[in-house]
Amino acid sequence: AGVIGCGGRGSGAAFNFLNAANGVTIVALGDTFQERVDELAGKLKKDKNIDIPADKRFVGLDAYKQVIDSGVDVVIIATPPVFRPVHFQYATEKGKHSFLEKPICVDPVGYRTIMATAKQAEAKNLRVITGTQRHHQRPYVESYKKIMEGMIGEITGGTVYWNQSMLWFRERQKEWNDCEYMIKDWVNWKWLSGDHIVEQHVHNIDVFTWFSGLKPVKAVGFGSRQRRITGDQYDNFSIDFTMENGIHMHSMCRQIDGCVSNVSEFIQGTKGSWDSSTMEIKDLAGNVVWKYDYEAEKANFKQTDPYTLEHVNWINSIRGNKPLQQASETAISNMAAIMGRESAYSGAETTWDAMTASPLDYTPKDLNLGKMDMSTFTVPVPGKPRDQNK
């Protein structure tokens, strides 16, 4: 495997991959910054006795091409998500199986690239998996089965949450240029992360679209920036999604210290409800009719970590020549989050048809690792014209 993006998530995914199966190794690393590549190379040597020679350590905004062209079989792509569509596109062109960390796009242009590339990957018999680890987490998989069996009846709505304390940030150092600073602080900049509703909360939105089999047709929401320190993003969102059949999903996410936390999903049905915070299904009277058995999982399965299990399933699909292509499904959840974000930013109702056809592109023109016009990166204000919310 080659690893593209050697920060925290890329490093984590690299070790998840190595722990997922025998006979796998990492042979090439790429990142925008030399220190990131060298840090991961050092960890691989220390913990796994894997040597990454200097000629397999690639640096710069085009390092992804060098990793993909270095003779690898598969790629782990974990760069800031604005780059995901282009990196996936190149990997697919070169015939590589891909692990794409979520989110896999931050805007409609990226969404369309992902959807088109996913079709190409299928045509080439490539295995593509995304970092939506709940799809491989047994409590979620078993809950999905119970809901598909009709245990809660017909789904009538739900609420999904990712409310937590403030995420990490980087203060600018005087030796960093504009682009270098933003990439090192990427989770706080709209163009790089897509804002936290896309970058993080997509996990919870994805659970509802997965369990219901529905995509949203419109979104109305709001959000604000209360205590964020760097970047140009919001730190809270609340979105009402109307799904294809008319039911509603309420989505809320927050990254503010000192507030109540909740990372879970709740789905209501005509016969009962499911709550991921307890992994229980209750009937309409509030009686628990099913509960996931964590002790049985520990007793029956050697591996329970979902971050490793997603790599187990990816490797098994490649070795067993079994179809696996999650990019298009994840892209739909991603687009739902984008719809919610754009409604909050603008104060307008967004629709699936309009957003999927939108020319909105967050990637700066003529991007290079140097000076950028920082005045263009402003916090969105609802009710202002779209061209003032870039």
Language model segments and positions:
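Beta-strand-loop-alpha-helix segment that lines the small-molecule cofactor/substrate pocket
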Residues: 85-136, 150
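Predominantly a Rossmann-like dinucleotide-binding segment in NAD(P)-dependent oxidoreductases
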Residues: 5-9, 124-130, 134-231, 239-241, ...
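Rossmann-like NAD(P)-binding element
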Residues: 66-86, 99, 106
